[in-house]
Amino acid sequence: MNKRDFPRVHFYDQDFVDIYDKSWAWIADYWTVGDARKGFPKDKFFHYPPSRTLDQLDQVFASFFLVYSNRLYAASNGLDALYGKQEESGAIRGSYDLESGEPVLTKDNPEGLAAPLFAWAEYNLYHKTANKKRVKEVMPALHKYHQWV
């Protein structure tokens, strides 16, 4: 296997293998460049186009899948886009409108709180990449976020 290619799946059910391969092809179509004027970094991150929001859960779960792309896709850029939206209080809202950069708040969830899964995602990234520098860089944001929660 080429280290600069996606991991290959060898499985008896070719339909399963085809879905796996197609999912990597679809991901290539769903990269969004952040807009610095709206508070997002200029790095590309995964985003499913029908939704016009950047969602915490989507980015956390995307990081679990993208970490297996052999660095063809950055698994942490979506998380970094959310860290970039962190407020002085430590708040990182669960969803942000990509057009305005504003948090999406509802009557049922006026704080925009989502499940606090950032630390879990970062643990997984560290477990797969052993990037100690990243842990050191994101720890202050995670600490502030958990104080807010």
Outline where the language-model segments fall.
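Aromatic-rich carbohydrate-recognition surfaces in CAZymes
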Residues: 52-149
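Low-complexity, Ser/Thr/Pro/Gly-enriched N-terminal "stalk/linker" regions
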Residues: 1-54, 77, 81
